[in-house]
Amino acid sequence: MSKIVVAGGTPLYGDVRISGAKNAVLPILCATLLADAPVEISNVPYLHDVITMINLLRELGAGVTMNEGIEAKGRSITVDPRWVRQRVVPYDLVKTMRASVLLLGPLLACYGAAEVALPGGCAIGSRPVDQHIRGLQSLGAEITVENGYIKASVSQGRLKGGRFVFDVVSVTGTENLLMAAAVAQGTSVIENAAMEPEVVDLAECLITLGARVEGAGTPRIVVEGVERLKSGQYAVLPDRIETGTFLVATAMTGGRISMQQVRPQTLDAVLGKLTEAGACIEIGADSIRLDMQGRRPCSVNLTTAPYPGFPTDMQAQFMALNCVAEGVGVIKETIFENRFMHVDELLRLGAKIQIEGHTAIVQGVERLSGAPVMATDLRASASLILAGLVAEGETIIDRIYHLDRGYENIEKKLGVLGASIRRMT
């Protein structure tokens, strides 16, 4: 099993290219099933979850080709949905990735039936699919859960437009309903919709392919269904969580970094907290520069919340920052009930963290000490790498398959910035 070895103590300097967003490309790949001709998606990151989704699409019968592209634009994937015949998404492929549930809406909407195994993925809390099911039922779907599968059908041949109010904000629930509504008969209204940039990116992709969508990025999305989407090309937005992770890494190590082709407007909450921590940040239309040369960060307080609040996917990275910051930082997790699993591993490195329910109180220390640690989920693995970058000695991070689900070549990108980091098999 692969491990990552980090030797701390080197500030990060230089430029880095941010990959396409994992949480945008997965629903967009699912959305290609709504088209009646090939669709090309560019700026696709090479991630374990992306490969899993490609395998799922192929299992359904879709033709999928991957083009390496050029460094500046990333890979492209062309999906030809015209050969889809299968309606069952098997557990063997679904078990490692929660986003597989996003195939439910497109399959049901286009083919009138779908069976999707209940999904797997990171073990960071209960993320039930009941909102997906109730949303699709509001469009006329008949759904049961049997033997570990969500079984859905449409008795009248085509989903009908309807109105649905989410009980709680759900990103993937919003995406599933949005895709299904795009080819439903009539107008659908989605209330209390997720406002994340990845939802907006999906909507913009659907519009590019011929969908009629208004209000994406607000709590109310209106979709006027069309019969089928068309062929087209779309570029995935840059990954805001990868962007934030590299910014935090640079702030922790006292370095300087420049990023091009990013979306600063999707990172307001993160950039605000980095400024509070003492970083000097310059923002352009599609660029970010952060300078923390020779300075120790200050602790920050934060509470995770749905967008545009502070993203839960950046909580672990900021906890790592608070571990070596000056002062005491308080972190409240409100999205997932089990997302402090990285704390025990940070404690092994010498961090001072006290957990009180859904709150972590972090007393910054001047230095951490390298030690063997174990990744427990995707973002926790990133936080351990960040901690290793500032720890004395070597930090060996085990179970990094979590990392490969969401970060493309993170050790190579950090190495270009000057980090002493390598993958060991």
UniProtKB/Swiss-Prot annotation:
UniProt binding sites for UDP-N-acetyl-alpha-D-glucosamine: 98, 127-131, 313, 335
Keyword Cytoplasm: yes
The keyword Cell division is annotated on this UniProt entry: yes
GO-annotated molecular function: UDP-N-acetylglucosamine 1-carboxyvinyltransferase activity
Pathway: Cell wall biogenesis; peptidoglycan biosynthesis
GO biological process: cell division; cell wall organization; peptidoglycan biosynthetic process; regulation of cell shape; UDP-N-acetylgalactosamine biosynthetic process
Subcellular location: Cytoplasm
A GO CC annotation given for this chain: cytoplasm
Main localization category: cytoplasm
Pfam families: EPSP_synthase
Principal EC category: transferase
Catalytic residue positions: 122
Alphabetic keyword roster: Cell cycle, Cell division, Cell shape, Cell wall biogenesis/degradation, Cytoplasm, Peptidoglycan synthesis, Pyruvate, Transferase
Known function: Cell wall formation. Adds enolpyruvyl to UDP-N-acetylglucosamine.
The protein's name in its UniProt record: UDP-N-acetylglucosamine 1-carboxyvinyltransferase
